[in-house]
């Protein structure tokens, strides 16, 4: 039986995600972001709610990406997630994409020319952002056209790069429904962006998300729930460059801007430049919020939930890797657990995220 790995955020889970799980083969393992996501923002609902939505709609196992993997640029996000899925026994990597490309060939090219491609990046002007440099690299070595690029396309290339040299079959699945950033409500499959924007429209949410009651009943947050905390950190700390990925230039820009803004989006708009993209600034604000440091990644894999079929696979994997099913006095990953405690500050109804929590168990459906 195939073991298919899927990297996801499910922010929140919607019918496009359900379609992807339906198209994937065999046992399906999801490596999912925790309470903070790749583009640098708090997840709309907590990791346990999102994991349960996935398990009720086709996933067999959901494991958590550590904070330092989940809140990263595309390449680091993809590499960390693919490494975890490989250790979990995945032989196939399924992912959504808008483009009809031969990702296996792209992975082969990167495996053969990784050194040259990395050296090429070093020759590019520092005024370019890292995503712009990466696009130029792919254009030069593979001829890919980025004129209509989208986040899923960028991530798909990052997955191909991360899978180079690994025994992984790549299974790209064409995205269905609304575009990634679409805020439209009249689409057959609404995007996560649209669902977050219109979360107060109960009828729309019921139409757009499977297991929608889980989403509607869970405490919901966004960046504005944490703005005062971010402002406090920026104003009260004399130096910010001890925080992960914060240099003196960005620290100065943040300290200058924070006294003039009244929201996270205003702050991001004031601080971002061609070099410091909005996504990068949001990630930096997330690092400041949780006081992140550069740390080693945890050895164990934290399991958020599983089905009966998933449980059988986990029993086999316990012989070769460390499976963390319950977090007690000894931390799984201190940085992730600190981030979770801060996430709880965004809403008084968010439950404890780690201590005493056991994996969600879903009985066989249908």
From Swiss-Prot:
Iron-sulfur found in the keyword field: no
Gene Ontology CC: one annotated term: cytoplasm
Example of a GO biological process term: tRNA modification
GO molecular function annotations of the record: ATP binding; ligase activity, forming carbon-nitrogen bonds; tRNA binding
Keywords: ATP-binding, Cytoplasm, Ligase, Nucleotide-binding, RNA-binding, tRNA processing, tRNA-binding
Alphabetical list of PANTHER family matching this protein: TRNA(MET) CYTIDINE ACETATE LIGASE
Family as reported in the entry's similarity comment: Belongs to the TmcAL family.
Protein's UniProt name: tRNA(Met) cytidine acetate ligase
Source organism of this protein record: Streptococcus uberis (strain ATCC BAA-854 / 0140J)
Gene field: tmcAL
């Amino acid at each position: 039986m195939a073991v298919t790995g899927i990297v996801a955020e499910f922010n929140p889970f919607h019918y496009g995600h359900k379609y992807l799980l339906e198209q994937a083969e065999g046992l399906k393992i999801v490596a999912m972001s925790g309470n903070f996501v790749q583009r640098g923002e708090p997840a709309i609902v907590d990791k346990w709610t999102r994991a349960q939505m996935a398990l009720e709609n086709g996933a067999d196992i959901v494991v958590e990406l550590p904070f330092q993997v989940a809140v990263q640029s595309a390449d680091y996000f993809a590499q960390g997630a693919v490494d975890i899925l490989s250790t979990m026994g995945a032989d196939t990597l399924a992912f959504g994409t808008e483009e009809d490309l031969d990702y296996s060939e792209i992975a082969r090219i990167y495996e053969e020319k990784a050194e040259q491609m990395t050296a090429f990046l070093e020759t590019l002007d520092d005024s370019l952002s890292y995503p712009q440099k990466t696009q130029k690299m792919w254009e030069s070595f593979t001829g890919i056209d980025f004129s209509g690029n989208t986040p899923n396309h960028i991530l798909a290339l990052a997955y191909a790069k991360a899978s180079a040299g690994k025994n992984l079959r790549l299974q790209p699945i064409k995205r269905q429904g609304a575009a990634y950033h679409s805020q439209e409500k009249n689409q057959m499959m609404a995007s996560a962006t649209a669902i977050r924007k219109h979360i107060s429209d109960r009828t729309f949410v019921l139409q757009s998300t499977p297991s929608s009651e889980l989403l509607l009943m869970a405490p919901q947050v966004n960046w504005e729930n944490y703005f005062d905390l971010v402002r406090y950190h920026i104003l009260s700390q004399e130096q910010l460059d001890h925080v992960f990925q914060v240099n003196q230039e960005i620290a100065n820009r943040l300290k200058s801007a924070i006294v003039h803004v009244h929201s996270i989006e205003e702050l991001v708009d004031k601080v971002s430049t061609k070099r410091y993209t909005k996504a990068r600034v949001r990630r930096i604000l997330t690092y400041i919020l949780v006081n992140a440091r550069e740390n080693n990644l945890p050895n164990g894999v934290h399991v958020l939930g599983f089905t009966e079929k998933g449980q059988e696979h986990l029993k086999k994997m316990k012989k070769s890797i460390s499976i963390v099913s319950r977090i007690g006095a000894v931390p799984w990953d201190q940085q992730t657990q600190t981030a979770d405690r801060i996430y709880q500050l965004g809403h008084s109804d968010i439950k404890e995220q780690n201590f005493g929590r056991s994996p969600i168990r879903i009985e066989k459906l249908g």
